[in-house]
Amino acid sequence: MKKIIIPVAAIVLIGVVGPKFTGNGINEGLDNFVSILDKSPGYIATIESRETSWFSSSAVINVGIDPLMFAESGLNPAEMVPFEDLSATINVTAQHGPFLTLNGLNLGLSAWKAEVDPSVFRELLAYAEDEKFYSVTGNVGLFGGVNFEDIMPKFTVIPQDGGDEAITFSGWNGKGTASSESATYSGAIDLVTVSAEGVTFEMQSMILEGSVEGDWTAPMRGDFYNSASQFAIASINVDMPMLDTSAKLEELIIDVKTQKSEDDNLMDMAINYAIGSIQAPQFSGRDLVVKTEVNNLEKGFFKAYQEASAKPAQMEQSIADMIETKLLPQLQASPEINITEMSGKVADGNFSGKVMAKVSAIDSLPESLEDPAFWVSKAVIDSNLKLDKAMILWVGEQVVANQIQADPNAAGMTDEEIKAIAGEQVEGMIEMFTQQGMITVNADGEYEMTFTMQDGQAMLNGNPMPLPF
């Protein structure tokens, strides 16, 4: 599957960046497009050939994955062979306006399309003979706005080396707009199924939506940007009959928003997760929510980290250089990691909580970055967790059960016996923690834990908590 998935990332990137080359003039835009793609972490892009006439232009672009990404993957030479040429040829055609017929009759500055060769992945995938594995078409209006659509056909994976896997993909349909002020995109997959070695996997209705303000190639250059996106899956089902095990997840939603500062030097990022329900062996949950924020990301540090991540072979040296030259400006910006909400229902219980952690008032780095006293003196933490009675009983039972299972003397006990013993012990454990002040009971009958730290002083439920340094 790696031989398929990794090159697909390169091909689909055409749909993400492709509209860029239509805005300024075909040839200039094409050069900019390839330059942006080639500088994107992990990608290689070159113009193999191009032709330009009065009414049209065409080019052949080669897009691939940089093999240096796998230089320190730990794979032996034989396993590295599939990664040596992870590339695809993209045929780009553009028609000059104002009268356009390339993608249907229209008026505009230009019309364009980009398609992979008809032979792409034929040895690995089965899809209709009259279709390309990936294509994107678009028009540039008279005022410079871009509309485009991209398509990936329905396909099945051809089993390799006598395997019995069966993988189907219902196809991808996406559409978007782009201008000098913003860009939008949305796409969907109806169904993905996988069956291999007695395990079946089914994913239904995956939707991706997103928007970016300003120059929408900024994320690819490592610049900061304002954006909003959502990734949603209606359901995921996994069935493993040989283990008499199955799991189901419904209504997964991931929202991501970014907001840059007015001077473009800082960016806040919010990532929110929501799950309608999940059913798995020994676990069930409903209305699960985790809302997170990463605030005050500093531009130089963020960009250096992206560049280091794209070069695994030089990662160690890149990280060392980044710490030496970029870490202090990031820390001076007072970075924050916040969980503004975590809540839901697990088994028959409810929980809710929040965590805020940041560093502040850092003017210089300590002689040793491993000095815990320095970080404690600069850290600010504010956290709270609430569990109702059913929830704390469930958590306590899991803790006690894990302790019993780790005891060699319990090796012959059944899960039912372990659960029964855990149920007998958990009430006493909770009472002990309450008496010790590790947890409190609030006016609503909820079990609560509050931990704060500032100026090197830690507090647990309002009481000073000694630190080991």
Residue ranges and their predicted role:
Residues 1-4:
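Positively charged n-region of N-terminal signal peptides that target proteins for export
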Residues 6, 16, 20-469:
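Glycine-rich, small/hydroxylated-residue low-complexity segments
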